[in-house]
Regions:
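Substrate-binding pocket helix/loop in short-chain dehydrogenase/reductase
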Residues: 90-91, 95-103, 208
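Alpha-helical segment proximal to the catalytic Tyr-Lys
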Residues: 119, 164-165, 236
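C-terminal helical subdomain
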Residues: 175, 199-234, 238, 247
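Residue(s) in the substrate-gating loop at a strand-loop-helix junction
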Residues: 134
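Short, small/polar-rich loop/turn modules that mediate ligand/substrate recognition or access, typified
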Residues: 167, 172, 238-240
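Short C-terminal tail/terminal secondary-structure segment
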Residues: 2, 139, 216, 239-251
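Active-site helix of classical SDR
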Residues: 114, 151, 159
């Protein structure tokens, strides 16, 4: 622990498991005044900080949550948008409801959170926003990630727009693009592919590992290190970029 976020108010969404939890743990260990949210209020248990249930698809809930947080913590220094959903399939497998749900959770949730918490950052004339995008499809085309890739590409565009709009006001906004990461979300995808293909879980998992140039999956902690850097003052001259942590997958 070196206090890289000492005293900074940092909010992490989807902090109950996987990448979100690893980021929240790293932030707390580095001295952040952590606010960790998840749709399931039980998942963030064990984290050091303020733990709250939050549905990032509901603007009214976000606004009520923001009022409570503002009274206790004041404006945010760091916002990490981590909530997301991976749809399995091509354009032919994507019904309107799949498209709408994916866009709502993967993109509009970030829009809602930024729109709500950015004004406080502007008052402080400083803030770092970190959006979790993906190397999959948004950077490199991957089969069966049609709407997921579209939404994560939108996250990169959203990130660049916010960075450009508020660069003069002390706001930085960056995207993190993970490759294939060992996480509950990956487990769900492996199960889905196994059920659709009739192949065993072990064989499907081997396929995921085989497409990694480094010959292994990434870890949530490796993504968290990058998020920590982008949240901290160490990255004070960096904004508006999509940063890969993909084990060379996009090469």
């Amino acid at each position: 622990m070196s206090g890289r976020l000492e005293g900074k108010v940092a909010l992490v969404t989807a902090a109950g498991q996987g990448i979100g939890r690893a980021i929240a743990e790293k932030f707390a260990a580095e001295g952040a005044r952590l606010i960790a949210t998840d749709l399931d209020p039980n998942k963030p248990q064990g984290l050091r900080g303020k733990l709250r249930k939050l549905d990032v698809r509901a603007q009214d809930d976000i606004e009520a949550f923001a009022r409570d947080i503002s009274r206790e913590f004041g404006p945010l220094d760091v916002l990490v948008n981590c909530a997301g959903y991976v749809h399995q399939g091509t354009v032919l497998d994507c019904a309107d409801k799949d498209w709408d749900f994916s866009v709502d959770l993967n993109v509009k949730s970030m829009h809602r959170m930024i729109m709500t918490f950015l004004p406080g950052m502007l008052e402080k004339k400083k803030g770092s926003i970190v959006n979790i995008a993906s190397a999959v499809s948004s950077i490199r085309g991957v089969p069966n990630r049609y709407v997921y890739g579209a939404t994560k590409a939108a996250v990169i565009g959203l990130t660049k727009a916010v960075a450009a709009d508020f660069i003069k006001q002390g706001i930085r906004c960056n995207a993190v693009c993970p490759g294939t990461i060992e996480s509950p979300s990956l487990g769900d995808r492996i199960n889905a592919v196994s059920q659709e293909s009739g192949r065993s879980l072990d064989l499907v998992r081997q396929d995921f590992v085989a497409r990694q140039p480094m010959g292994r999956l990434g870890t949530p902690e490796e993504v968290a290190w990058l998020a920590l850097f982008l949240a901290s003052d160490e990255s004070g001259y960096i904004t508006g970029h999509a940063h890969l942590v993909d084990g060379g997958m996009a090469l």
